[in-house]
Curated annotation (Swiss-Prot):
Similarity comment text for this entry: Belongs to the 4-hydroxybenzoyl-CoA thioesterase family.
Residue stretches spanning the membrane: none
Protein's recorded name: Acyl-acyl carrier protein thioesterase ATL1, chloroplastic
MF (Gene Ontology): fatty acyl-[ACP] hydrolase activity
Source taxonomy: Eukaryota, Viridiplantae, Streptophyta, Embryophyta, Tracheophyta
Gene symbol of the encoding locus: ALT1
Function, as annotated: Acyl-ACP thioesterase involved in the production of fatty acids and beta-keto fatty acids. Can produce fatty acids of medium to long chain (12:0, 14:1, 14:0, 16:1 and 16:0) when expressed in a heterologous organism (E.coli). Possesses thioesterase activity toward lauroyl-ACP (12:0-ACP) in vitro. May play a role in cuticular wax synthesis.
Lineage: superkingdom: Eukaryota
Amino acid sequence: MLKATGTVAPAMHVVFPCFSSRPLILPLRSTKTFKPLSCFKQQGGKGMNGVHEIELKVRDYELDQFGVVNNAVYANYCQHGQHEFMETIGINCDEVSRSGEALAVSELTIKFLAPLRSGCKFVVKTRISGTSMTRIYFEQFIFKLPNQEPILEAKGMAVWLDKRYRPVCIPSYIRSNFGHFQRQHVVEY
């Protein structure tokens, strides 16, 4: 568990390379705790390195009164993409939940680019953009198939919670899984 020192580290700018807007400023306990992952390069399409992809299809009950996917449903798509990504690197979110602990999304920013309609097929792309001792930073994209039209960009942060739902350090075996994934997907900028 982190020990309080009574000092506050300055806010650290975290820049997500796919967003042209101002950087997300996240307060961190120490500027040395953030570890950016070098596992990605923004190339788009199926050639994106370090990215997990899952194809889905819009269901009628996900639509709003205007005939497009309700904005709240996109967060569900993102969560599903996160869970599937975690499973591919050996982390089963259901098992974590049954143990009484949780990996909880504490921040999620979504930029809507275009709507999805009933029957549209799309791909959710998820990648981890960085980690610290207590946080996981991720980026997600939704593209409409078959033409890869950008639908959504999202960025977020997840924290590990203990059985009392208090934030704690991410267990070493989880950090190890991320490290292993990073080593497998290192690319040059």
